Amino acid sequence: MSEKTLNELSNTDIAMFAIDEAHCISKWGVSFRPQYEELSKLSKIYPDAVIAGFTATADKDTREDIIHKLSNYNSKIFVQGFDRPNLSLAVEQKDDWKKQILIFLENKINESGIIYCLSRKQTEDVSEFLNKKNYRAIPYHAGQESSVRKNNQEKFMNQNGIIMVATIAFGMGIDKSNIRFVAHLSLPSSIESYYQEIGRAGRDGNPAETLLLYLSLIHI
C-alpha cells in the first residue's frame, strides 16, 4: 500500500477493510510485493475499523504471520474444512508428457480447463501442440503484453472449451465455476500452491479432474 493511498484513506471514514488472497501478505510481502508490509499501518490509522482477511490456502504458520503483519493481535480466526470431494486427483511420474496429457484430455474437447507450466516458453509450446490436436488452447504468462493477457483471460472466462496453458501468473482472482480440469506439467512450488491451483476446478460442485506430473530424481 503506497503512501499516496494511505494519505487518501486518512481523510476517509472507513468501518472495514476486506483483504482478499490474504496469504499474499505472508508469501509475497517481503520481496515480491513489499507494499503488503504497509497494510500493518491500517490498524494504526483506523484503530476502530474491522480488518478481515480471506484466503483459501493458509496453514497455521501462515495465518499467524498474516495476523502479525497486520498488527491485529486480537484477531478471531475462522477455518473451514479443506475437503473438496468433487475433485479427482491423479499423480503420475512424467514419462512422455504429450502422450500423458492427451490421455488426460480424452473426452474433454468441449470443456474448460487450466494446464500449469513452469516456464513461459513451455506455455507457448504446449498451446501450439494442443492446437494441432484440435483443442482450443491459449497461452498466458507475464511476458505477454497486458492487452494480450487481458484478451486471453476474457476468452477463457466467457467461452467454454478453452484450455488456458499458463504459468502461475494466471489464476489470482479467477472465479470461473465450470472449470472441469486442472493439470500440472511440473511440481508446484508448495502444497499450498498446489491446493489453491487445483481448487480453481469444480467450483460449481460438479465433478472435476486434476493431474500432476512429476519427475523422479535419483541420487547416487
What are these regions (language model features)?
Residues 1-218:
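Helicase motor core with emphasis on the C-terminal RecA-like subdomain
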